[in-house]
């Protein structure tokens, strides 16, 4: 499952927590994982849960809710099921609360893993920065994790002789 793991803080270098960043995801469902972060095989609706980012809200609005998937992940570290049906389309938008920098995520992949840097602790950065828990967010476009073991997940195997071709773009502007 090829993806990337770029960390973003749209308020800028050394600006601390991303919990006030605002995010919208074009997704009605997510794939919960167990305590070892392995998907359970379920596809669950985001409706009425802290996983619902169909309308823009702050990353920190419900990140510490007493909701099992968030407790197991120590925050957001989940795959959302995208509605793009394999088309290259805008699937997410994140806005820095202080900077007004907007990052749009476009992809043809069926999923996006959102990770809120739940396990960063005293991570050395450039120019003397020290990154802490939730100082960044990752939006990792991908196939569903563990798809090879989950019969109800979309096929994710690239067979000999086949070409793997995918496109993801991160577009930035100021609001």
Where are these regions (language model features)?
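An exposed, glycine/acidic-rich loop-and-rim segment of catalytic or binding clefts
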Residues: 1-175
């Amino acid at each position: 499952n090829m993806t990337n793991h770029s960390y973003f803080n749209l308020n800028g270098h050394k600006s601390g927590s991303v919990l006030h960043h605002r995010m919208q995801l074009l997704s009605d469902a997510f794939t919960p994982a167990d305590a070892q972060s392995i998907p359970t095989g379920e596809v669950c609706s985001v409706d009425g849960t802290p996983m619902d980012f169909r309308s823009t809200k702050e990353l920190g609005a419900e990140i510490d809710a007493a909701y099992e998937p968030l407790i197991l992940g120590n925050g957001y570290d989940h795959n959302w099921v995208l509605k793009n049906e394999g088309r290259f389309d805008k699937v997410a938008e994140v806005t820095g609360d202080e900077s007004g920098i907007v990052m749009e995520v476009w992809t043809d992949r069926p999923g996006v893993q959102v990770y809120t840097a739940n396990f960063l602790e005293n991570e050395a950065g450039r120019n003397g920065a020290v990154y802490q828990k939730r100082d960044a967010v990752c939006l990792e476009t991908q196939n569903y994790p563990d798809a090879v073991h989950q019969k109800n997940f979309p096929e994710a195997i690239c067979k000999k002789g086949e070409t793997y071709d995918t496109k993801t773009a991160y577009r930035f502007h100021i609001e």
